[in-house]
Amino acid sequence: ELVQVAENEIKLFVDVLKGQKTGFFIDQRDNRSLLRQYAKGKSVLNVFSYTGGFSLSALAGGADSVVSVDSSSMALDLAAQNVQINEFSGEHKSLKMDALPYLDNMDEAYDIIVLDPPAFAKHKSARHRALKAYQRINEAGLRNVKPGGMLFTFSCSQVVDNQLFFDTIRAAAINVGRSISVLHRMRQPADHPVSIYHPEGEYLKGLVLSVD
């Protein structure tokens, strides 16, 4: 059964029983609000969109168009419902595809691209493979940001720390020949506190990049 909730006056349905993390990633609340501030008049691509949290925030901020890409039909159906109940003026389109094939083969550039993948590594033994995956998706994302546009990119892998993530994004930019500048460094919100005795609790990290 779906439950309707609200975040910053945006209405949305969540599946608290079957959805991931009780149906909505509340740890991205502040970061969605940040995207909203930059979205007015922009074209936005939200990859690994799930039920459309970042897409809804972009539309609420006045984005002209938003494309949500995810591999789950159920998540995309819910995203479409969430867009519908808010009656946004911007255009929204959902695409059921795996992220990497879509990013590698897309022929359209966007003002803003959001990359919010699942955790690519849950153990240190998988960290090297995860870093390669982060680099690859960010290379693909950076290729498709319009000059002067922005990339919102995240990692929720606890074993990939802030410096490793930063170094990986820098390598991706160098490989595809894009000049980037850091506008914001993002993390989980205050209701997901990090104990000084357990720094590993700081699992969510992100960057907002200006791309030239």
Question: Where are the language model's segments positioned?
Answer:
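C-terminal catalytic and target-recognition region of SAM-dependent MTase-like enzymes
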Residues: 150-212
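Non-catalytic substrate-recognition/targeting regions of SAM-dependent transferases
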Residues: 1-25, 33
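Conserved SAM-binding loop of SAM-dependent methyltransferases across substrates and taxa
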Residues: 51-64
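Conserved class I S-adenosyl-L-methionine
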Residues: 41-50
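Helix-to-beta-strand junctions that scaffold the AdoMet/dcAdoMet cofactor pocket
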Residues: 88, 145-147
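S-adenosyl-L-methionine
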Residues: 74-114, 120
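Conserved SAM-binding motif I beta-strand of class I
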Residues: 65-70
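Mobile active-site "lid"/loop adjacent to the S-adenosyl-L-methionine
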Residues: 96, 110-140
